[in-house]
């Protein structure tokens, strides 16, 4: 929910996980007592452990469960990644399909020198251009320690199709975000999305989403409320709104096995569905297996196999729709 563009592009890794508290020998505001036997005063300052964590973003509420489900594959796909420097990388992707159109994509990623963590550096520029001239591009930058902004553009051949501007503010125990999509002052159209997520306790986070859209002859607002409870090895999330309901449950059985259940109900489509997915990770064998089955009797599975010391990753996927008696499979190879 809240995604204005249909274009997909990689997002920065681990952007939604809350920062771990720093390890300090003495809590902030305290000094070592000069002699033994002294006890802290009742009006001591709040320690790092007493503070509520940042809950992440609203869009990441269901992500942990949805990442367990396999991505549908069809045809043959070859991807070649090449790092030109520590900051710049390009990739070439060729897809051959029996159902859709075969295509070629050229992608480029630039990561700046503003290091904020082991896996985060800004600004980030991501672009993808296909053989028809259509472009998907994103620019992500950490303006301050709390404010992050993103600009996304999508063109179809020589015409602008979509563009959006995101601004996100992360406080100590809350995250607020505003997205403006396809604004047109002359026509009087556009989409405005506002998100807010607040940590109530270390385990419970509550928030909401407000979507306002306007175009000639049509104007409307859709509101949704969300709650997420996080335990040491499971997470439950529920979103309720005028558009329907969305609930997910994620459970980590052990270091190798993770399972998830997803429920979706749409008031517009008058349809409900339940999906079950799991992920099996075997690091010693360099294998990653994902499987799923839903209430529409669609069964799918993907298998990824890394071939060290070569920079190769093999991927195979198969999906069977029992109701429509339709089967499709795919094979992928990633180099680099």
UniProtKB/Swiss-Prot annotation:
Positions with biased composition (Basic and acidic residues): 42-52
Places the protein is found: Mitochondrion outer membrane
Annotated segments matching region Disordered: 1-58
Topology in the lipid bilayer: Multi-pass membrane protein
UniProt function note: Channel-forming protein essential for import of protein precursors into mitochondria.
Protein family per UniProt: Belongs to the Tom40 family.
Entry protein name: Mitochondrial import receptor subunit TOM40 homolog
Encoding gene (name): tomm40
């Amino acid at each position: 929910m809240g995604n204005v563009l249909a274009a997909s592009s990689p997002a920065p890794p681990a952007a939604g996980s809350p920062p771990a508290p720093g390890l300090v020998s003495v809590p902030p505001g305290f000094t070592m007592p000069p002699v033994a036997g002294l006890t802290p005063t009742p009006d001591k300052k709040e320690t790092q452990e007493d503070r509520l964590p940042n809950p992440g973003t609203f869009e990441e509420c269901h992500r942990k469960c949805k990442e367990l489900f396999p991505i549908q594959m069809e045809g043959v796909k070859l991807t070649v990644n090449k790092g030109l420097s520590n900051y710049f990388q390009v990739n070439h992707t060729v897809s051959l399909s029996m159902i859709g159109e075969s295509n070629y994509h050229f992608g480029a990623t630039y990561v700046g020198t503003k290091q904020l963590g082991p896996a985060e550096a800004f600004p980030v520029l991501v672009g993808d251009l296909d053989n028809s001239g259509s472009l998907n591009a994103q620019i992500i930058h950490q303006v301050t320690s709390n404010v992050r902004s993103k600009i996304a553009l999508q063109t179809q051949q020589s015409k602008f199709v979509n563009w959006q501007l995101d601004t996100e503010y992360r406080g100590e125990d809350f995250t607020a975000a505003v997205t403006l999509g396809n604004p047109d002052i002359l026509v009087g159209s556009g989409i405005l999305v506002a998100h807010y997520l607040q940590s109530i306790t270390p385990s419970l986070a509550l928030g909401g989403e407000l979507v306002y859209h306007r175009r000639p002859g049509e104007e409307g607002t859709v509101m949704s409320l969300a709650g997420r409870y996080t335990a040491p090895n499971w997470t439950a999330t529920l979103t309720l709104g005028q558009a329907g309901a969305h609930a997910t449950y994620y459970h980590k059985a052990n270091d190798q096995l993770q399972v998830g259940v997803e429920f979706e109900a749409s008031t517009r489509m008058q349809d409900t569905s339940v999906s079950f997915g799991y992920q099996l990770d075997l690091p010693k064998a360099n294998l990653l297996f994902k499987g799923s089955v839903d209430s529409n009797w669609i069964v799918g599975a993907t298998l990824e196999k890394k071939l060290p010391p070569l920079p190769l990753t093999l991927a195979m996927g198969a999906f069977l729709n029992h109701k429509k008696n339709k089967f499709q499979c795919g094979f992928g190879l990633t180099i680099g």
